[in-house]
Amino acid sequence: MKKKSAVKWLDEPAGKDYSAAESFLQLPYAPKLARVRVKELKRAQMSRYAAKDILRASATPISEIQAFDWTKQQDEIDKGAPLSPILLVRPEPGDRLIVADGFHRMCAVFAADQEIIVPCKIV
């Protein structure tokens, strides 16, 4: 049995994560609203949630997690490199949570241990 690696995290998301989030958010939102959401994310306080809860709220099926290639992120975890916190957006009540940036990190963390507490910003 492979030993579980401890996941290390940066204190704040990296600057490039916000750009990636804005690019992704332009798919479900108009560009102007995507920019507004990213500005909100930049101002948001850090939060912490269990990996399994984030994935459940995002309605991500396990088969989808297994389909992605997140070996790069798993290698970073194994090497002890700190990961950037993820960026989350709550759409309308009842809609699935949007992982605006950090989906592959989320998959790698969940695969390592679904109970891991994940730092994130959420709006």
Where are these regions (language model features)?
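A short, basic-hydrophobic beta/loop patch
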Residues: 2-11, 83-123
